[in-house]
Amino acid sequence: MARFRRADLAAAGVMLLCHFLTDRFQFAHGEPGHHTNDWIYEVTNAFPWNEEGVEVDSQAYNHRWKRNVDPFKAVDTNRASMGQASPESKGFTDLLLDDGQDNNTQIEEDTDHNYYISRIYGPADSASRDLWVNIDQMEKDKVKIHGILSNTHRQAARVNLSFDFPFYGHFLNEVTVATGGFIYTGEVVHRMLTATQYIAPLMANFDPSVSRNSTVRYFDNGTALVVQWDHVHLQDNYNLGSFTFQATLLMDGRIIFGYKEIPVLVTQISSTNHPVKVGLSDAFVVVHRIQQIPNVRRRTIYEYHRVELQMSKITNISAVEMTPLPTCLQFNGCGPCVSSQIGFNCSWCSKLQRCSSGFDRHRQDWVDSGCPEEVQSKEKMCEKTEPGETSQTTTTSHTTTMQFRVLTTTRRAVTSQMPTSLPTEDDTKIALHLKDSGASTDDSAAEKKGGTLHAGLIVGILILVLIIAAAILVTVYMYHHPTSAASIFFIERRPSRWPAMKFRRGSGHPAYAEVEPVGEKEGFIVSEQC
């Protein structure tokens, strides 16, 4: 019996040891090279309770980050720094859970793009359907089908907004809708609309004219503009199928991309004949005057920021919501401007009475007014400085080198017309990593010379106008006073009284043999037979 008891105890010990080792292997290792938390990686990405790590995206202009449940704090200094993480309030996860989210819901984590925070919703999430605006259920009189855009290729048309839409902190009251699946937001209409300053739910070589079912329509209810590309086909690959998607611009600055029909992966769409982009972009324009040609100006467009979304996430029944972040342009006073704790180094320019980071659509005004030289440290920014003092720009340690793309165009100083064909950006001249001074106007000396030239021209024109006006007044006076001394003076010296003159060329042959007074000849009339 003792032997059996010992054998039983030994067997039980072996079983317990095996069970312990099995449990240890399952929870400590799982699969080689993976932690047990990786099994719930999708839920962790959606609800990262205590994660502090930052996943850096390989794409430029943005970075990926995970949130925790600490109270929301403003990101210090510049958001362009890659190593920062932004927390969120504790009610974030509870709100999603109360809305009926489950473990099967796949929500892309928020992505900080400096100016916007984007969130991508997949087909399994109900928000993808909630964010889609059904235009067919809207008021018929407010839904407009653009006839030209629905029957042409590479066309764009202006659309006036019934509200002010904030885009990168600038308020827009009109946009330009293009057939290529994007909205152009620039004020200067040029031939390279696809280069920058766009809102692109899906920019590609769409041609609504190849199908009768293809339409471009929009709807404005006073608080939002919805632009929908319905059943549009790619011009260079019609057999891929039709695409249906929309972009919604809300009064509060939010931008929503909704996708209903995406027959293929966006990464498979060819960009040979037209750029393929999904995201946002903005730029500032610098105007250079050409001294040699007075009526021609050269415009250089600098792209200062871009939001590039992951094209692989764009599928059927998906959506993207982009929420604007605070910018320096929203502050109207020096104190709030320099003491702001947002993601930019805000500075106050007293000459313009404007708050700015130095990089927005008013860049040329900022530089021409000497604002970079005026800016001092935040402690002395709002103090009155002596006229002779030279200001220096002081920034925090989290500064980031700005990256630009440059588009240079030349145009005459006349009102431009809407181009009938909008080519791709193959001819766009791009310069990366430009210096700060490169974005400013570098022809101040030429402008001074041009200003002096224009002043002299204006004075000459005024003198000529005065001479002509005096001649007209003298003529009118002599006509009404023929017996005055001035009238008699000019009558006695009229051209018919001038002496005969001979004009000879250098060769000695006369051009005119003799010029005789008309009054000394007898008049005659030549009559012709009818």
Curated annotation (Swiss-Prot):
- Region described as Disordered: spans on this chain: 378-399
Location, primary (coarse class) = membrane
Q: Which UniProt keywords apply?
A: Glycoprotein, Membrane, Phosphoprotein, Signal, Transmembrane, Transmembrane helix
For bias kind Low complexity, which ranges apply?
A: 390-399
**Where would one find the signal peptide in this protein?**
1-30
Tissues of expression: Expressed in tumor endothelium and in vessels of some normal tissues, such as the muscle and lung.
Quaternary structure and interacting proteins, as annotated: Interacts with CTTN.
User: Encoded by which gene?
Assistant: Plxdc2
User: What GO terms fall under cellular component here?
Assistant: collagen-containing extracellular matrix; plasma membrane
Could you tell me which residue ranges are on the Extracellular side of the membrane? 31-455
Protein name as it appears in the record: Plexin domain-containing protein 2
Please state which protein family the record places this protein in.
Answer: Belongs to the plexin family.
Please give the residue positions where the record annotates the modification Phosphoserine.
Answer: S507
Domain PSI residues, every copy = 327-372
Cytoplasmic domain ranges by topology: 477-530
Q: Where is the composition biased (Basic and acidic residues)?
A: 378-387
Q: Which organism is it from?
A: Mus musculus (Mouse)
* Glycosylated residues in this chain: N103, N160
Pfam families linked? PSI
